[in-house]
Amino acid sequence: MKMKKLTSLCGCLLLSMCMGVGAMTAPLSAEAAAREKVILDADMVDLFDDGIAMMMLAESPKMDLKGVTIVIGNTWVETGTASAIRQLEGIGRTDIPVYMGVNETVRKDRFANMKEEKRIYGRGHDSHLGAAGYPQPASWQAEYRKNYNDEPVMNPQKEHAADFIIDTIKKHPGEVTIVAIGSGANLAAALDKAPEIAPLAKRVVYMAGAFFCEGNVMPTSEFKFGLIRKPLKRLTALLGRSKSSCRWMFAARN
């Protein structure tokens, strides 16, 4: 109970800080055009890296967060959607749209295989299984009510996350940065559907992989690379063949 109260208090303090920063640094209209257009693609959780990254992007005067796309990974899309909506409500940014995306591992047996690989090869430095560690929720609304004991103020958009990525990049060629801190499957789905967007993105910043150390869930694999391998191979292949100046950046996790 004390831990729950402490977590709630920390969350309220952080949300208040974000709201304060936003009020103090509200960008002028003349500066709006210069802000970097960003799509955040995340397997969203409350606070931690995903939630904090979203709030920083939402409140930065240098960033124009066009939308948040939710993908399977640390959480099911239903859980991630509820989390993103709750946090955007908390900082008063219900104007930022949320899109639900890829909610499966492509290979239907991937979750079971991950557990078997852990048994055979041993664990990495934690026992994280993400969405594989709990049953898929019935809906994002059910997750919201269960986790926050409240009713949501906003709703996710009807458009699929991959379609939103495609539409936004085509609308703003050479201007959109994709910050992918989830599994990357939404971006892979977008590139599968519309490979012509590869040279139109400004850059892709992707957080995944374990460099110069063992993986976090298995000695041979970092969680996100281990969860969805095939889409990531397509993703890197498509962007690698692009003749544009789109930059492909990795942020290592260890």
What label would you give each PLM region?
Residues 1-10:
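Positively charged n-region of N-terminal signal peptides that target proteins for export
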